[in-house]
Amino acid sequence: DPYGLGDSDLHFRVLDIPNFGNAVTSYYYNTIGGYSAVKMQRYQDLIDRYISSEIRQVFKATENAATVQEVAAALPELKVVSMLNGRYIILDGNISPVLNPNAYGNCWFVDSYIPAATPDEEIALLAHTDLRNTAVIGDDFAWAQDAIRHFENSSDCHFELVEKSPTIALTHYAPNELRYSFSTDTERAAIFSEIYYPKGWKAWIEPEGAYGEVRNGHYHPSGEGRPIELFRADWMLRGAMIPSGEGQLIMRFEPDSYQLGENISRASSIALILLLLGSAAGMILTGRREGKNA
């Protein structure tokens, strides 16, 4: 921890402006930026269209600031950096990182959505949408739009029955597994500051206090757990419909290719064992026959 952030949160990101294009800071923190030879095109589009612009806004707003406190006071609202949970901003390696008070956190509930008919419209809508309360969802996830629309219609009629604010929070973080606890009186849409990647990430809802088993690297829900679908929101983030009640959401990276490899490996092992057993049985029978003929 070269900057001594001392942050007890399970997961947040750092925007290191001087080292934005390399992996120096990524060794210590989760970062916005960094170098990757396999960077997703949608992420690169987000950098080109929004994050680069927000970095320029930071420089312009803080160019006359002489102290960390003045930098913090002058910091503009950074919508895309905030939705990516960019909690700290490094302007200069010689001064302390600046806290971004507007960071959305690891996850949040939204009350509504705006549909996007095309990818161009989807990324453009980020500039004009209150992303803290409204999600931008492409028409390729019409089922998620329908689910949120149903919630909107229900809340309009029964808002007075909602007695407490819904909550959702990250409780466990690992590169291949995330767990969130939630409490809500009605079904709601949650957005997560994680990259949507359909080829491997799977999700389950578990009742409060329940957790399935991880066997051979794969998550097996408890008897009461049920799988749910994830959707893409705000150009590249994950979204999920959270049912009413209390419980936990588990996301785990389990690509089908891994499962296929496991099955092939298991089948090969069984075949090898059967072959060895068959060979051993053959040797025993041959030995008995030779003994009788002796």
Where are the regions a protein language model picked out?
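Extracytoplasmic/lumenal acceptor-recognition loop(s) of multi-pass membrane glycoenzymes
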Residues: 1-81, 99-153, 198, 208-211, ...
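Residues that flank catalytic or metal-binding motifs in active/ligand-binding sites
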Residues: 10, 85, 94, 176, ...
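Short, hydrophobic beta-strand segments that form beta-sheet elements in well-ordered domains
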Residues: 13-16, 86-91
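Extended recognition/assembly regions associated with phosphoester-bond processing machinery
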Residues: 59, 68, 86, 93-94
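Active-site-proximal, structured, solvent-exposed surfaces of multi-pass membrane proteins
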Residues: 75, 81, 135-294
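Conserved hydrophobic/aromatic beta-strand scaffold that supports enzyme active sites
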Residues: 95-97, 239
